[in-house]
């Protein structure tokens, strides 16, 4: 169990050649993200995330803006910091989740390997829903726009959304080792008692039969 799907929406900014020469607001575009994943224990999980939209690149001196459509997909390792460092509490409402992963990106005839990372703050609304805010960054091939300037191109985004957990969310707390040891000791005592009873020689009882004769009368 502990499978989930999430949908986030926000904005991203593209960092490539000549981006610093343009107004920052002109680098910002809409950023949708969808993901499916699974938590394997209270503090780590994996997700497959995909998204797309448009990027705004620029020519020399930001003379022209390039409107480019793209898609990406990545797989992330996720780690819940509070659940990791604190005792697991199924009723905990808030957690901070850094993530890191790899993936791929495509734009027209250009493809690139990507390195992906960021941090998520999530709040438990109910057993099925979390609200989250997520900041993420991505590094990819310099050839996605123009070669030169930065050694790699990058994308940074800020999104907000919701996560839906399928039935069966949560984990059972394992008993403490002292309790396990105590139960094992009690079972050993019972096993020894059973063995002693099985090895005990049978008790032989001598039964004397008493014969009662009628009294003869003369």
Predicted regions and their residues:
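Short glycine/proline- and aromatic-enriched beta-strand/turn motifs that initiate or cap beta-hairpins
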Residues: 1-37
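Short loop/turn motifs that connect adjacent beta-strands in outer-membrane beta-barrel proteins
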Residues: 1-2, 43, 83-95, 125-128, ...
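Residue-level detector of the transmembrane beta-barrel scaffold of outer-membrane proteins
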Residues: 4-6, 45-47, 95-99, 130-132, ...
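Residues on the lipid-exposed face of transmembrane beta-strands in outer-membrane beta-barrel proteins
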Residues: 7-11, 34-38, 75-81, 100-104, ...
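Outer-membrane beta-barrel proteins
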Residues: 14-20, 57-61, 86, 107-111, ...
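Gram-negative (and chloroplast) outer-membrane scaffold detector with strong preference
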Residues: 42-115
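Predominantly the C-terminal beta-signal and adjacent terminal strand-loop region
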Residues: 59-63, 126-199
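Heptad-repeat positions
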Residues: 180, 187, 194, 201-204, ...
């Amino acid at each position: 169990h502990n499978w989930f799907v999430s949908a986030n929406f926000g904005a991203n900014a593209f960092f490539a050649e000549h981006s610093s020469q343009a107004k920052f607001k002109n680098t910002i575009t809409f950023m949708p993200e969808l993901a499916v994943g699974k938590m394997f224990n209270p503090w780590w999980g994996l997700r497959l995330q995909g998204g797309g939209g448009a990027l705004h690149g620029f020519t020399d001196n930001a003379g022209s803006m390039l409107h480019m459509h793209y898609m990406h997909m990545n797989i992330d390792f996720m780690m819940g910091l509070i659940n990791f460092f604190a005792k697991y509490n199924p009723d905990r409402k808030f957690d901070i989740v850094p993530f890191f992963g790899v993936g791929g990106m495509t734009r027209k005839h250009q493809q690139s390997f990507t390195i992906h990372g960021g941090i998520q703050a999530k709040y438990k609304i109910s057993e099925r829903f979390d609200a989250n805010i997520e900041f993420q960054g991505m590094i990819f091939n310099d050839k996605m726009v123009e070669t030169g300037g930065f050694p790699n191109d990058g994308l940074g985004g800020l999104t907000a959304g919701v996560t839906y957990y399928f039935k069966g969310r949560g984990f059972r707390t394992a008993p403490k080792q002292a309790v396990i040891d105590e139960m094992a000791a009690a079972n050993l005592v019972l096993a020894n008692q059973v063995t002693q009873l099985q090895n005990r020689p049978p008790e032989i009882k001598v039964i004397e039969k008493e014969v009662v004769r009628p009294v003869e009368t003369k």
